Amino acid sequence: MRLVVCLVFLASFALVCQGQVYKGGYTRPVPRPPPFVRPLPGGPIGPYNGCPVSCRGISFSQARSCCSRLGRCCHVGKGYSG
C-alpha cells in the first residue's frame, strides 16, 4: 500500500515539475479599454448655443443635451472631451 501511495505521489510530482498539469500559466487581469471619446466640432462652444465653454456649473440635463446635440461630452474631472 505504501508503495502505491509513493508511486502516485512521485508520478503527480513529476507531471507538475514538467508543466504537464498547469499548462495555463498565470494570466493577468485584462485592462479596461479607454472610454470612447467623440471628436469635438470645430471652434469653441459658447453660451450662444446653450453649451458653456466649461463643464463646471452646468446641470446633468444640460450636459447630456450638449453631448447628444453637439458631441461635446463632459467627463468627470476632465472637462469636455478632446
From Swiss-Prot:
One term of GO molecular function: chitin binding
Q: What GO terms fall under cellular component here?
A: cytoplasm
What cystine linkages occur within this chain? C51-C66, C55-C73, C67-C74
Q: In which tissues is it expressed?
A: Higher expression in hemocytes and to a lesser extent in heart, testis, gills, intestine, lymphoid organ and hepatopancreas. Traces in eyes and subcuticular epithelium. Not present in the brain.
Location in the cell reads:
Cytoplasmic granule
User: Which first-to-last residue range defines the signal peptide?
Assistant: 1-19
Say where the protein is mainly found.
cytoplasm
Ordered alphabetically, the record's keywords are:
Amidation, Antibiotic, Antimicrobial, Chitin-binding, Disulfide bond, Fungicide, Pyrrolidone carboxylic acid, Signal
Q: What does this protein do?
A: Antibacterial activity against M.luteus and E.coli bacteria. Antifungal activity against N.crassa and F.oxysporum. Presents chitin-binding activity.
Family indicated by similarity: Belongs to the penaeidin family.
What is the name of the protein in this document?
Penaeidin-3b
Q: Tell me what organism the protein belongs to.
A: Penaeus vannamei
Q: What is the lineage of its organism?
A: Eukaryota, Metazoa, Ecdysozoa, Arthropoda, Crustacea
